[in-house]
Amino acid sequence: MEKLSETTPNGTSPRTFALNHSRPRSSFKGCSRISDYELLGKLGEGTFGEVHRARLRKTGALVALKKIIMHHEKDGFPITALREIKLLKLLSHKNILRLEDMAIEHPTRQTDKRKKPIVYMATPYMDHDLSGLLDNPSVQFKEPQIKCYMLQLLEGLRYLHDSRILHRDMKAANLLINNKGILQIADFGLARHYDGRTPESGVPMGEGKRDYTGLVVTRWYRPPELLLQLRQYTPAIDVWGVGCVFGEMLYGKPILAGESDAAQLDIIWDLMGSPNEENMPRWKSLPGADHLTPRPRTGNLETRFRQYGSGAVSLLKELLRLDWRTRINAVDALQHPWFKMQPLPLEPHEIPTYEESHELDRRKFHDRKAALPPAPKGGTVGVGPDANGATAGFNSNEPYGNGRNGVNGGRYRNGPDDRRPAWQRERGAGLPPRPPPNNDDADFRERGPPRARGPPGPRGPDVDTYIPAYNRDDPGRRRDDRPPPPRDDRPPPRDDRRRRNSREDRRFDRDRGTMSRSRSPRHDRSRDRDRPDHNGYRR
């Protein structure tokens, strides 16, 4: 066996060579300890973690610490968190959230040594998220401010798509804004690289090249091609989400708030028109369209958004185009004439400052729980009591002018409905109301869990296939995607017989001379007294 050389080609020892060519130790940055931060309060809780406001003790800088929740510790570190960390370390853009540090919280007591350390992601603290701002009744968006936010959102999206990254969960709650007017795209737990060309000016995205999971994007921001189970999708799915966010900023609340997959498609057809070979070619060939026969309708987007001007309507129609192959891309959307119309967009530093507004602050503003259906967990199917998500916040037969940013203002109405029971009130954009009481179900909270999901296939009319389980009555409870135990659908045993468990009942029976299984009758039976050999019963 040949002996390895003890020197490098230039005559130095391997150790000396390594020391001469090594990076300085100051260039390596490991993970901080959670004790390096002072926790200041909880900002929110999502599918994959909690977010806390904190201050770095060394510099005093405010950060957001995202606690990565280990739902199934035996499975190891969540793949979604690994993917998010990897992508955030690769990206660098003013409109993309930056990952600044990772922090570790080790078990403190000797008895907790078997527990795994808790990992936190540290990002710059942002004063608001767009969903929280839209729910803040003291905030009123004007057109120049909406244009400023839309330009920043499209700039960030163009950078992502130029980097061949799909976000796959574009929604208002994932858009962070600070009091300097800067908007940043956050939450890359569902993001991934995609195979395909990057967007070009004047060139539609066309067809996708490979299959991806369809269990992505929160329902209210989900494009029709995903609802119809297209697997070879493109960056056009993110553009649809931007269109939903744009309409939400104009109107003041989500414009496509469906209660289930089928309902989501129905309100999309109401807004954009029924699919046909002109506006959505070959839509019938999609797996989820086999049994669909939507009633003919022309769409009412122009009527509903007419008050916001022809430019806004034109951009919204391009962003929400049913045909994903010809849907506008971020490059062309940035050049849309609406941004050059009066009033012109504000500069970020010209946008007014607001009190801190995050998705969790909905309870502070309106004393209600979060309205959004939870984001799907990529690649898995969730089951749980909230399979149909939240109720719709948009009536397709109602003009958009009554939204909070519309001509009539007042997103949250007070009226005679406030004195009705919860199950009789009109549904808003919040949680589903409590069902009415009935004789067959004395306490609806005691119902068993829903049936477990079956294998993939044609969906029923009101079954949602991607909403993970949450107990909305207990917001601190972790999600559980494991299927529920088998449900026994047999009716309960009858309990309508009178039970003689008391001494008084037995005494009452004896006094009335009723028959009893536990003792002989006190008096002779008439048929026995008539017998010739009768001597009488003796006790």
Swiss-Prot record:
* Keyword presence, Phosphoprotein: no
Listed A to Z, the keywords are:
ATP-binding, Kinase, Nucleotide-binding, Nucleus, Serine/threonine-protein kinase, Transferase
Reactions this protein catalyses: L-seryl-[protein] + ATP = O-phospho-L-seryl-[protein] + ADP + H(+); L-threonyl-[protein] + ATP = O-phospho-L-threonyl-[protein] + ADP + H(+); [DNA-directed RNA polymerase] + ATP = phospho-[DNA-directed RNA polymerase] + ADP + H(+)
Which positions in this protein are listed as binding ATP?
Answer: 43-51, 66
The EC designation for this entry is 2.7.11.22, 2.7.11.23
* One Pfam family of this chain: Pkinase
- The record places domain Protein kinase at 37-339
GO CC terms, sorted = nucleus
Main enzyme class: transferase
One of the entry's Gene Ontology molecular-function terms is: ATP binding
Q: Where is this region: Disordered?
A: 1-27, 370-539
Query: Which InterPro entries does the UniProt record give?
Result: CDK, Kinase-like_dom_sf, Prot_kinase_dom, Protein_kinase_ATP_BS, Ser/Thr_kinase_AS
Q: Where in the sequence is the active site?
A: 169 (proton acceptor)
Q: Which residue windows does the record flag with biased composition (Polar residues)?
A: 1-15
Residue spans with biased composition (Basic and acidic residues)?
414-428, 471-514, 521-539
Subcellular localization, as worded in the UniProt entry: Nucleus
Name the family the entry cites: Belongs to the protein kinase superfamily. CMGC Ser/Thr protein kinase family. CDC2/CDKX subfamily.
Functional description taken from the UniProt entry? Serine/threonine-protein kinase involved in transcription regulation. Phosphorylates the UBC2/RAD6 ubiquitin-conjugating enzyme (E2), leading to monoubiquitination of histone H2B and the silencing of telomeric-associated genes. Also required for histone H3 methylation. Necessary for the recovery from pheromone-induced growth arrest in the cell cycle G1 phase.
Which protein, by its recorded name, is this? Serine/threonine-protein kinase BUR1
Q: Which organism is it from?
A: Gibberella zeae (strain ATCC MYA-4620 / CBS 123657 / FGSC 9075 / NRRL 31084 / PH-1) (Wheat head blight fungus)
List the top taxonomic levels of the source: Eukaryota, Fungi, Dikarya, Ascomycota, Pezizomycotina
